[in-house]
Regions:
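Catalytic alpha/large subunits of respiratory electron-transfer oxidoreductases
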Residues: 1-271
Length: 271
C-alpha cells in the first residue's frame, strides 16, 4: 500500500511523456493488458514488449506469427532458415525440423545460422545482404519450384539491428515471390524466443502515435524519461550510471536483474 501511494504521488508530478514501460520475455498477457489500459488512460504512450530492440513490424499479425504452426513442419518439403539458431533458441522446433529431415522429405537451405545444427542442408554463409541480390533470388526460385508446403523461418535475432525492418520486409517479399505464402498455405514463420512476445503484440503493447520503442526509451532515460516501469523486463539492458533523475518501478515475480536496480517493487503472481 505504501509503495502504491509513493508511486501514485510520483506519477502526479510528471508529464505523460516522462513515463515509459518495457515488458520482458515472460510477462503474462493479463498483466500486459492491464498495464496497457492504465497507460492509455493516463495518456502515456511510451511502452513496448520488444525489450530486445526487435524491429518486427506491428501492423500485420502475420508478420510476427509462426504462421505454418509447429505441426506444419511435419508437412514441409522445402525449408529456408534465416538468422536464427533453432538448436539453442527453440529446441522443440529444432527437433521437429530434424524429425522431418530424417524422414527424407525435407530439403533445407540456411543463411546466417550456425553450422552445427543436427540436420544437413546447403549453407549460404553469413551475409544477410544476399536476400536483396538477384542471383540469390534466382537460386531460391529454383529451390522452391514445385514445393507443396514451403517454409521460410526468419529469426527475431537478426532483425534487432537498425536494418531490422528492411530485413523483415525483404524476407516477406521473398516469401510472396516464391509462393511460400498462398491462399491455402502461409509458410512465412517468424521465430521469437520470448514466451510473451506474440501475446504482447496481439494486444498492442507497442508504441503508437508519438510513443517510443524500447530502443528510444533506453536512449532517453534520465533525459526525458523520468519514470520507468520494468514489467518483468530483467533482460532490458540499459546504463544505470547516470540514472539519478530516474525512478525505476519493477513489477514481477522473478526478482532477477531488474529488481535490485529498482526504487519501487510491486510483486506479481508467478503464474
Amino acid at each position: 500500500e505504501e509503495a502504491l501511494s509513493v508511486l501514485s504521488s510520483k506519477i502526479k508530478t510528471l508529464k505523460s511523456y516522462e513515463v515509459a514501460a518495457v515488458s520482458g520475455k515472460l510477462t503474462d498477457v493479463e498483466t500486459l493488458y492491464s498495464a496497457k489500459l492504465l497507460f492509455d488512460k493516463l495518456n502515456m504512450h511510451h511502452y513496448d514488449c520488444r525489450y530486445n530492440f526487435s524491429q518486427v513490424p506491428t501492423k500485420n499479425r502475420s508478420d510476427w506469427l509462426f504462421n505454418a504452426s509447429i505441426e506444419g513442419i511435419d508437412k514441409a518439403d522445402k525449408l529456408l532458415i534465416i538468422g536464427c539458431d533453432p538448436k539453442r533458441e527453440v529446441p522443440i522446433i529444432n527437433a521437429r525440423i530434424r524429425e522431418r529431415w530424417l524422414s527424407g522429405f525435407l530439403d533445407i537451405r540456411m543463411l546466417c545460422v550456425p553450422d552445427d545444427l543436427p540436420y544437413e542442408g546447403i549453407h549460404h554463409g553469413n551475409d544477410i545482404s544476399l536476400i536483396s541480390q538477384k542471383t540469390f533470388l534466382d537460386t531460391l526460385q529454383s529451390f522452391f519450384s514445385n514445393a507443396k508446403n514451403p517454409i521460410i523461418i526468419l529469426g527475431d535475432t537478426i532483425i534487432k539491428s537498425n536494418q531490422g525492418k528492411l530485413i523483415h520486409s525483404q524476407v516477406k517479399y521473398l516469401a510472396n515471390k516464391l509462393n511460400v505464402i498462398r491462399e491455402d498455405w502461409n509458410g512465412f514463420c517468424f521465430l521469437t524466443t520470448d514466451a510473451s512476445r506474440v501475446g504482447g503484440l496481439d494486444i498492442g503493447f507497442f508504441p503508437k502515435k508519438d510513443g517510443y520503442c524500447a530502443n528510444k526509451i533506453k536512449s532517453r532515460l534520465s533525459k526525458e524519461i523520468k519514470l520507468l516501469f520494468l514489467i518483468e523486463a530483467d533482460d532490458f539492458v540499459f546504463d544505470t550510471s547516470n540514472s539519478s533523475d530516474l525512478t525505476i518501478v519493477y513489477i514481477g515475480h522473478h526478482g532477477d536483474i531488474a529488481a535490485p536496480l529498482s526504487d519501487i517493487i510491486l510483486p506479481s503472481s508467478a503464474y
